[in-house]
Amino acid sequence: MEFTEYLMNKHQLKKGERKLREISVGQYENRLINMEREGIYRGEQVIDDELETRLSKRYKDWKTYRRTIRFFIDSKGY
C-alpha cells in the first residue's frame, strides 16, 4: 500500500486512529519527501536514538516528523 493511500485509510485499518483530511495527508507526504531529500530519514525500519537526534537537530517541532516516519513504517505493513 502506498504511503498516501495508507494515510487516507489508516482510520479503517487501525482502531483508535482518526481520519486525516486530504491537506494533512499532503503535509505528511511532503515532510517525508523533504526528510529523505535532506538525508535525515534513510529508510530505517525502526526509530532509534540516532534518528531522533537528527530530527531534533533539524526541526523545532521534531515530534511531528517522528510521527510521519512512524506512519511511513506502519504503512509498509499493509
Where are these regions (language model features)?
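N-terminal DNA-binding module of tyrosine recombinases/phage integrases
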Residues: 1-8, 74-78
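Positively charged, polyanion-binding regions of nucleic-acid-associated proteins
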Residues: 8-16
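Non-catalytic DNA-binding core/recognition domains of DNA-processing enzymes
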Residues: 17-78
